[in-house]
Amino acid sequence: MGSNIRAQIEAQLKQRILLIDGGMGTMIQGYKLQEQDYRGERFADWHSDLKGNNDLLVLTQPQLIKEIHHAYLEAGADILETNTFNATTIAMADYDMESLSEEINFAAAKLAREAADEWTAKNPAKPRYVAGVLGPTNRTCSISPDVNDPGYRNVSFDELVEAYSESTRALIRGGSDLILIETIFDTLNAKACAFAVESVFEELGFALPVMISGTITDASGRTLSGQTTEAFYNSLRHVRPISFGLNCALGPDELRPYVEELSRISETFVSTHPNAGLPNAFGEYDLSPEEMAEHVKEWAQSGFLNLIGGCCGTTPEHIRHMAMAVEGESPRVLPEIPVACRLSGLEPLTIAKDTLFVNVGERTNVTGSARFKRLIKEELYDEALDVAREQVENGAQIIDINMDEGMLDAEACMVRFLNLCASEPEISKVPIMVDSSKWEVIEAGLKCIQGKGIVNSISLKEGKEKFVEQAKLIRRYGAAVIVMAFDEVGQADTRERKLEICTKAYRILVDEVGFPPEDVIFDPNIFAVATGIDEHNNYAVDFIEAVADIKRDLPHAMISGGVSNVSFSFRGNNYVREAIHAVFLYHCFKNGMDMGIVNAGQLEIYDNVPEKLREAVEDVVLNRRDDATERLLEIAEEYRENAVGKQEDASALEWRTWSVEKRLEHALVKGITEFIVEDTEEARLNASKPLEVIEGPLMDGMNVVGDLFGEGKMFLPQVVKSARVMKQAVAHLEPFINASKQVGSSNGKILLATVKGDVHDIGKNIVGVVLQCNNYEIIDLGVMVPCEQILKVAKEQQVDIIGLSGLITPSLDEMVHVAKEMERLGFDLPLLIGGATTSKAHTAVKIEQNYSHPVVYVNNASRAVGVCTSLLSDELRPAFVERLQADYELVRDQHNRKKPRTKPVTLEAARANKVAIDWQSYTPPAPSQPGVHVFDDFDVATLRQYIDWTPFFLTWSLVGKYPTIFEHEEVGEEAKRLFEDANEWLDRIEQEGLLKARGMCGLFPAASVGDDIEVYTDESRTQVAKVLHNLRQQTEKPKGANYCLSDYVAPKESGKKDWIGAFAVTGGVNERELADQFKAQGDDYNAIMIQAVADRLAEAFAEYLHERVRKEIWGYAADENLSNEELIREKYQGIRPAPGYPACPEHTEKGPLWELLNVEETIGMSLTSSYAMWPGASVSGWYFSHPDSRYFAIAQIQQDQVESYAKRKGWDLLEAEKWLGPNING
């Protein structure tokens, strides 16, 4: 199946330039869809906002997506992309729609398939194809989202593989002809995607053609994760795609040099689908179809293109003009690329026939470097990184990393170190050699490197079957491989055996596995000479001659080896060892040895070895004399005074002799943290005031960083590293600055915050770093920041600009709210809007009209500096704002052409569609123990059994489900340590009473009256104690009810005697005092730990108490017998909704709960003015017993319900709108 499609498409590509379609998001945006459009009927009651979930439209608006497909096909597109850019389970998690990923991918492929087939039927001479799209996800596998923890990852390779596998299967099942891995900004994500795709192909028994398309993100010409175009290509070349290309981020002008480079280096067809130019000052794409076609025609005439299409800002008209531009132009002819081993880190490394000897740094090996082993054992990873950095600075073109030591967790150490290496551009620019005798360590390492690395090593020692299995996986991971000359019989120690084993391995790898011969690197075993054992004397000669044999008989294979092994007999005399290495390598290189694992800082030059010593060494290495060993031993003593070896190359630390100002600047530019505190302190002592250090050398260094970044000479990982150094320096100076009450100068003070309800801040952090590098003072409030805090800090700190960020769709409404509050409170600051779900359209239509001062949509970090400069310049601001407002007016005019389609229902209609319960046939259970029950100083040992540990790990940003998180390759060990620490605290809490758990519950006679619930003082039901006010879902529902909590309590008129429960529990009595003690001691870890444990105890208490209520106190489920896992999954009868959460979102309803139970007086829990509970580790809510009761979400409500709710609560409309704001439609 796959081979036929590939042959068909390749035949087409050789004849003409094929057309890919254009921007799907651009076209969807043109429809001006509203929330209800995204929801459709099926998701009308979904608990979170869905607007912006474009992939969901294949289910809710399939006719619209098909209409877009037809438009592109009519314009001339040969290849349709499925509407699945964000359809992986990982990306769909933003909407809690992971379970729909497979269905969405299938439906999207099916829609595209139907459209393509219709057009193929119209003109069989122009067949149309479907490319199943796999987007990059919203996470990065090779970049930490936390600038303070470069080793942390928020997604693993295995999680990506699982997500991409599910999407791939569905895309194929839906009818895709090709798989398109596109908009790659993190190559490791793409490698995981390719791994998943190839695994699915193997599973299905056929392969489809694969297209790969990456994204160059800035002027440096690199991906977001730091790779050059060629390095990126080398990293994914193993996939053998039908096409390799670039898309998004840049317009044709900016993208041209990278397309040209790709066309030069790629053995396969080249594709590109650029944006319609760069976004202008207002965030829109200006390049017209005609202008874009001119660029495309020039590319075609220059011989760059095999496939062309469009990305952001492009439309069917752009594709139509592109089609006309390339008509009659010859497609790019595939070039003859010389066979070579093409490796990569952030930069490419090509090893060809004419390449000089490649040095592989050996010092990052715990078995070969005592210093490195000590640093890893003591977890001094910053210093261990220095070892790697020194190797690269001293000339290592590859670094070998080995963690095999009995007292180390080799797998965890390998993962941690490789993740940290990825954050150090000076190290990660070179390819990585993952070195281990344990396959699981090798595999864990391969899952951490975005470049094309080398595995060291595999062999035939355990037989052919194991050898083939490992080789296939290495190829799928995209690595080259070192093969040891070792089989079931043993290691090859003679020239003949070396060639025999290597030949056997080569034939298996190349002929059977399909491994590229240029990616096979043989290690024919370097053994020690001059050992005093005659049988060892010819070891070096055997190796040197075997090198020539292998190069002659095994085409394109390479040769490597551990060079230091040859001199092992002279350990302790480094000078002589280096002489042996120099002589040995000289003869090996002459015979064709390609690379060697060496100490890059201690390589001697053959001609620099003293003649007398060199001759004696040569006698040993070439086995020219029977007494060669004895003669070398004698001569070696003459060099004993040099036995310490050459001193460490002083040039690496030459900068330490510079002035302190220059040292600080150098440290910032290079991202060196080792000396930053001592240098900052020296600069402080030299300055008349501490602020001068920031405004002088530190800012000078950051200005250099900003300039280099702006010029494309420095890229994002380096900038982030520089920011880390700056933070450490400023942290040291802050106490002195505060003591002297100094105020510094900057280009402006900018407040950044991820809005309430959103935890995503990668983009915000990058913007902050870039602005800091351009001398803006940044106040970063972090994530989940409420409006009131943003505005309070903005006033207190007298900031010049406020910047809001958000990734998930509910953040858009929160941004509107912030703008309204800024207007209401009389702010006059510019407001910046950014984040993945934000858009110019939303900014213009929903946000800008609510605020009288500039609101600017900033779609990337590089644009932020120009925008801020314009906004804070008296000269530039008027013209900038005038253009901005004119542009937004145009956007609004376009938006208003389409009338919003909404499907609300009246409150009367919603009430008529309440939950249908036959109350006459149902007898509500009376409680066994009515009234209020208090649990003071409750037994912590009991609560421990009910803890749900998964959220505990999330508190520490460790993603994974308990207890399987302990097996997680990246976070498992850390999770175990946290778990142990938490349980140690729980032991202390039990034994010493450090925290108190208090709780209470009550069961009260109740009846529903419309949407509200009356709670009575006693069983006579004559006096109402409290009325609980509820909201009802108010969206049209062809199927299902419009839910309200009152539906689950017997109506007053039914005469049935029903009940309701209330509860409040806390695990945090004394929590604040304990945490404050630790903070005062500088122990943030235990401060956070005690709060996290208290939070888990509160949730466990809520779970325990609900179970006890069901089984004993109310007793309606006396026979219930559920495990803790089943309790966590809510497999029981009844619900316990909490005020402030989806089923009852209005927070003031906690008030009646507090009063019914007399909570504050009884157990000390209180409510703040905004109805937040105190202590923070607290839970409260209601108990409903009806077997049909279920959780649901109240989304948007209409004005009639707002008025009804206000009247029932005794509020005026203004008060109602304040508390119901998030749920009010419009």
Swiss-Prot record:
GO terms for biological process: homocysteine metabolic process; methylation; tetrahydrofolate metabolic process. Keywords: Amino-acid biosynthesis, Cobalamin, Cobalt, Metal-binding, Methionine biosynthesis, Methyltransferase, Repeat, S-adenosyl-L-methionine, Transferase, Zinc. The keyword Methyltransferase applies. Residues 6-326 form the Hcy-binding domain. Signal peptide: none annotated. Residues 651-745 form the B12-binding N-terminal domain. It catalyses: (6S)-5-methyl-5,6,7,8-tetrahydrofolate + L-homocysteine = (6S)-5,6,7,8-tetrahydrofolate + L-methionine. This is Methionine synthase. SMART domains: B12-binding_2. CDD domains: methionine_synthase_B12_BD, MeTr. Its EC number is 2.1.1.13. GO terms for cellular component: cytosol. Methylcob(III)alamin binds at E695, G757, D758, V759, H760, D761, S805, T809, A861. The gene is metH. Binds 1 zinc ion per subunit.
